[in-house]
């Protein structure tokens, strides 16, 4: 079962997925790393300091990796995961906290602004609704990696047992920061 762990850069995807990998021994595919390492991109955007993924090549490579493992929990970690996985968990964070996290990473002011706007406008959530069958949201604001991991585990365990309707606290659209948009 492929489960996407997605969200705006800086919401905690990589940190929490590495924790899940160690704790639950679930296979985690760090998609952004794979795209760069295996040259699964069409071009490099120097201005935005990013690569433009070739999604067809990415899908082909994932089929090679995942083929025959449909009964295993496989987590696809990336801000692009919602374009591939049918089930996604979106990590969200309060935009002012996101700004601090991205500054600490050394992001440019332009890239920080772009990501804060994307978070406040629910860009990934809207895209996930277009692409995915099941969508869940977790507010990671002020939460430790361990706390976030517990929320993810709860969601996945409920999905595996077929009880995801018992998860109203992760209902998409319950997190709203639109008032923060200038």
Curated annotation (Swiss-Prot):
Example GO biological process: rRNA processing
Chain positions covered by the region annotation LID: 104-114
EC id: 2.7.4.3
Presence of keyword Transferase: yes
GO terms, molecular function: adenylate kinase activity; ATP binding; ATP hydrolysis activity
Keyword Nucleotide-binding: yes
Region (NMP): 30-53
UniProt keyword list: ATP-binding, Kinase, Nucleotide-binding, Ribosome biogenesis, rRNA processing, Transferase
InterPro entries registered for this protein in UniProt: Adenyl_kinase_AK6, P-loop_NTPase
Annotated ATP binding sites: 10, 12-15, 105, 143
Regions annotated as coiled coil: none
Pfam families on file: AAA_18
Record field: catalytic activity: AMP + ATP = 2 ADP; ATP + H2O = ADP + phosphate + H(+)
SUPFAM superfamilies: P-loop containing nucleoside triphosphate hydrolases
SUBUNIT field: Interacts with uS11. Not a structural component of 40S pre-ribosomes, but transiently interacts with them by binding to uS11.
Function, in words: Broad-specificity nucleoside monophosphate (NMP) kinase that catalyzes the reversible transfer of the terminal phosphate group between nucleoside triphosphates and monophosphates. Also has ATPase activity. Involved in the late maturation steps of the 30S ribosomal particles, specifically 16S rRNA maturation. While NMP activity is not required for ribosome maturation, ATPase activity is. Associates transiently with small ribosomal subunit protein uS11. ATP hydrolysis breaks the interaction with uS11.
HAMAP family cross-referenced by the UniProt entry: Adenylate_kinase_AK6 (MF_00039)
Family the entry assigns: Belongs to the adenylate kinase family. AK6 subfamily.
Protein's recorded name: Putative adenylate kinase
């Amino acid at each position: 079962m492929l489960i996407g762990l997605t969200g705006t850069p800086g919401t905690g995807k990589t940190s929490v997925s590495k924790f899940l990998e160690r704790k639950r021994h679930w296979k985690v595919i760090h998609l952004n790393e794979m795209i760069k390492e295996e040259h699964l991109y069409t071009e490099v955007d120097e201005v935005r300091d990013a690569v433009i993924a070739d999604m067809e090549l990415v899908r082909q490579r994932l089929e090679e990796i995942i083929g025959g493992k449909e009964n295993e929990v496989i987590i696809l970690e990336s801000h692009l995961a919602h374009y591939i996985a049918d089930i996604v968990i979106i990590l969200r964070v309060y935009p002012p906290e996101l700004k601090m996290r991205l500054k600490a990473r050394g992001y440019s002011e332009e890239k920080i602004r772009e990501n804060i706007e994307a978070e406040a406008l629910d860009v990934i959530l809207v895209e996930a609704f277009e692409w995915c069958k099941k969508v869940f949201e977790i507010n990671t604001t002020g939460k430790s990696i361990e706390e976030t991991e517990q929320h993810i585990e709860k969601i996945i365990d409920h999905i595996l047992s077929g009880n995801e309707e018992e998860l109203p606290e992760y209902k998409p659209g319950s997190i709203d920061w639109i008032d923060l948009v200038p």
